[in-house]
Amino acid sequence: MAADGFSVTDRLLHRLAFSSAGLQQALADIEDRLYAKRIGAVEVTRPVFVTSLPRSGTTLLTEVIGSVPEFAAHTYREMPFLACPLLWHQISGPFRRESMERERAHGDGMKVSFDSVEAFEEALWHAFWPSRYRGDRIIPWEAGTAGESPEFDAFFRNHLRKLILLRRGGNAEPSRYLSKNNGNIARTISLQEMFPDGIILVPFRDPVDHVGSLLHQHRNFTAIHRREPFAREYMRDIGHFDFGANLKPVNFDGWLDAAGPVDPDRGDFWLRYWCATFEYLLHHRTANMSFLSYERCCERPRLALTAIASVVRLDAGREQLLTHADRFRAPRAYDAQALGLDPVVLRRAHQIHARLLDASVV
């Protein structure tokens, strides 16, 4: 959501909530005690994590999957006290505003409201793992990393219970957690270790079109952050390091060091990042990870949605997914020459893309 959509009170609350990681964790501890019995009765089974580089269709896929009542996910309603959703829901109830859709800051036609799914869990990872967010980059979570912080493992699992509990009521009885978080590409291995029955869904796009979209959004958010300082502050606090002044790419296999100085205002930066990301994910593909071609979703959406329903192991709601078939539309195409892409790196990208297509569930 754009920074101009926040009142003075909204900004003050945001700054209070993010003034100290300890404040939110202390409130979460209070919440644990207040709702202990109800939280303890909730099981976390078969969570679904939708993740990839941004601009790959993660938002649309999560909205579609999230339309099925068995899922619970983060929404803007949990802001700014992300770590204590039950407590904040109770406190903010009398002041809750009507949910009205508006185009998100990306300017891509996607609508958001207070009830839209968003990647707020990244702020929790950031609070517990600050050493992974190192200067201008993010360091991936490797095998065994999850066990290094049993405190976080317990906190995070408990947090998922809270969200599931929060979404219950009326005709909704969600039993599973749904995550949309591009930052999770840095920790797919850890997520499998933490949730052996979890499902990781990774959409991908043609590298040229994807790189063009990434470059466009980086320039878009660079301008937004320059124009609206609170927008930069807000996105930094919630862990959105995808674009603009807050950019922190994931340093898969040390690609940032191997590439040398590369300007993120150039297409080659994003092409190298694309290659590093998907080579890493293919090499470290876990048993519970599925790749999904976004272009094929647009070409045959009903077939794709049927495959997605099987991948995420829906208990019910398959017909609900199919009602969203007309939302999949071919994205804007880009030209490699106009983007000034290195032909050697581009050949490598096309080879990686061919492997992804072979692995795609559609």
Annotate each predicted stretch with a short phrase.
Residues 1-42, 215, 219-362:
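PAPS-dependent sulfotransferases, especially Golgi type II membrane carbohydrate sulfotransferases
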Residues 45-47:
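Pre-Walker A (Motif I) flank of P-loop NTPase domains
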Residues 51-52, 180:
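The Walker A (P-loop) glycine that initiates the GxxxxGKT/S ATP-binding motif of P-loop NTPases
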Residues 55:
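Walker A (P-loop) phosphate-binding loop of P-loop NTPases
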Residues 59-72:
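A conserved segment at the C-terminal end of the G1
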Residues 180-182, 191-216:
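Conserved phosphate-donor/acceptor-positioning beta-strand/loop module used by diverse small-molecule
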